[in-house]
A protein has these predicted regions:
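Gly/Lys-enriched N-terminal cap/neck module of very large, oligomeric protein machines
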Residues: 4-166
């Protein structure tokens, strides 16, 4: 479970600390409050590409640190394979981004992005708004059945098309 997020000098964030509790955690707020930056910082720490331009204006580096608590045997075994220890089930993943490179660490030990990505796949799932949808009506990208239903003239035809799709 992700218990803590620390972000420093990333985008508009000078420094931020977010504590997470057990169960579902939801970020809400006004437009422009920084929700996307927080999610982006988590993704960056977990190995996603991040532009150097995301470093806060006037700063030379940005830092994102995630703290996890886990008893997952797969995570603990993977850490052993990487010659890393998880004291009391705590895993700390950090990434420092500078103008020329980024450095990842797991529990204080330097590692590569691929190691972080493998570990991250066992620790966290992030689901954003509309990720479950398979179409984008605004851009005209819709599955064939939806287009067919939209253009069917009679209610009976629409019902048959839907029934066929469910069969």
């Amino acid at each position: 479970m992700l218990t803590n997020l620390h972000v420093k000098n990333l985008a508009l964030i000078d420094e931020a600390e977010v504590e997470f509790g057990p169960g579902l955690n939801i970020l809400t707020g006004e437009t422009g409050a920084g929700k996307s930056i927080l999610i982006g910082s988590i993704n960056a720490a977990l190995g996603k590409k991040i532009s150097r331009e995301m470093i806060r204006t006037g700063e030379t580096s940005a830092l994102v640190e995630l703290v996890f608590e886990t008893e997952n045997p797969h995570v603990l075994e993977l850490l052993k394979e990487m010659d890393l220890e998880a004291e009391e089930g705590q895993v700390i993943i950090s990434r420092k981004i500078t103008g020329s490179r980024s450095v990842c660490r797991i529990n204080g030990e330097a590692c590569n992005i691929s190691q972080v990505k493998v570990l991250a796949s066992l620790l966290l799932d992030i689901h954003g708004q509309h990720e479950h949808q398979t179409h984008d009506v605004r851009q005209g990208k819709t599955p064939g059945r939806i287009e067919t239903v939209a253009h069917a003239g009679a209610a009976q035809q629409r019902a048959e098309i839907i029934a066929d799709g469910l069969a």
